[in-house]
Amino acid sequence: MTETVTLQVDGKTYQLPLVQGTEGERAIDISRLRAETGLITLDPGYGNTGSCESAITYIDGDQGILRYRGIPIEQFEKNPNFVEVAWLLIFGKLPEQSEYDRFSEALTYRANIDESMTHNLQGFPRSAPPMAILSAMINALSCFHPEFRKVDDPDELEAVAARLISKIRTIA
């Protein structure tokens, strides 16, 4: 049986489910609040709001906590390693040595972009926002790599992720 909290407004009673967060914290699921009551919530700065469920990131700004897949960000500050962090975010764990070597090689091997992509990149004004350029270039990549659009086969995920990440590094 799901635990709930009771909200009473204008003589009506509403049951809102309790959910458990990544770190064991309890939360009230208000996703149906507006539809059922017409009410919204006010939480300045979103200090008491979890915006989504995530298996990737945990943030507690008051406590200064940031974790990726359960690993404190401080671990990556001490030993920053792009390949390890990319693997962790994609696959949910740090890579074994063989996985690291294979993924690292794939990132290097797949870095080249089509010549016309270079022309696209040169066509942007020098004053254009970098993220706007990067977004446009990533969208253009799907014209050359239809496999980026949808990955149905989990066995293909590693190759497609390596190809996309390597090209983003080249563009950036």
Predicted regions and their residues:
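Hydrophobic alpha-helical bundle cores within soluble ligand-binding/oligomerization subdomains
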Residues: 2-172
